[in-house]
Amino acid sequence: MRWALLVLLAFLSPASQKSSNLEGRTKSVTRQTGSSAEITCDLTVTNTFYIHWYLHQEGKAPQRLLYYDVSTARDVLESGLSPGKYYTHTPRRWSWILRLQNLIENDSGVYYCATWDR
């Protein structure tokens, strides 16, 4: 079965947050169930300590999936999420990738990355 995983990288902007303009960098991804997908978050801000990843599904409030602690290079999952489902890696400075494993239909939605203190 094929399904669409819509990816939107956006930065939220309350006063305590660092943000960046994505200039229309919306990406739609379609993958087979059981496969994996990667979502890239490029930032131009310095002194970033935490990268937060959110999933927004239609009719629901956005849900934080995890945050990545830059200083320890460690993901901190929200409670109730399966270890190994999501993880973050950084292929180069100021770029982070969220990898989603073992995709299911319920993984479809809009994904956001943001940065601010934990």
UniProtKB/Swiss-Prot annotation:
- A single GO cellular-component term on record: plasma membrane
Domain Ig-like, which positions? 18-118
Which residues belong to the signal peptide in this entry?
1-17
Where does the protein end up? Cell membrane
Q: Which residues are glycosylated?
A: N106
Task: Name a single GO biological process.
Answer: immune response
User: Which keywords describe this protein according to UniProt?
Assistant: Adaptive immunity, Cell membrane, Disulfide bond, Glycoprotein, Immunity, Immunoglobulin domain, Innate immunity, Membrane, Receptor, Signal, T cell receptor
Q: Listed GO molecular functions?
A: MHC protein binding; peptide antigen binding
Q: Tell me the disulfide pairings in this chain.
A: C41-C113
Respond yes or no to whether keyword Glycoprotein is given for this record: yes
Which PANTHER family does the UniProt entry name for this protein?
Answer: T CELL RECEPTOR GAMMA VARIABLE 3-RELATED, T-CELL RECEPTOR GAMMA CHAIN
Its function, per the record, reads: V region of the variable domain of T cell receptor (TR) gamma chain that participates in the antigen recognition. Gamma-delta TRs recognize a variety of self and foreign non-peptide antigens frequently expressed at the epithelial boundaries between the host and external environment, including endogenous lipids presented by MH-like protein CD1D and phosphoantigens presented by butyrophilin-like molecule BTN3A1. Upon antigen recognition induces rapid, innate-like immune responses involved in pathogen clearance and tissue repair.
Describe the protein's quaternary organization and the partners it interacts with. Gamma-delta TR is a heterodimer composed of a gamma and delta chain; disulfide-linked. The gamma-delta TR is associated with the transmembrane signaling CD3 coreceptor proteins following the stoichiometry: a single gamma-delta TR heterodimer associates with one CD3D-CD3E heterodimer, one CD3G-CD3E heterodimer and one CD247 homodimer forming a stable octameric structure. Upon activation, gamma-delta TR complex associates with FCER1G to initiate intracellular signaling.
Name of the molecule in the record = T cell receptor gamma variable 3
Organism, scientific name: Homo sapiens
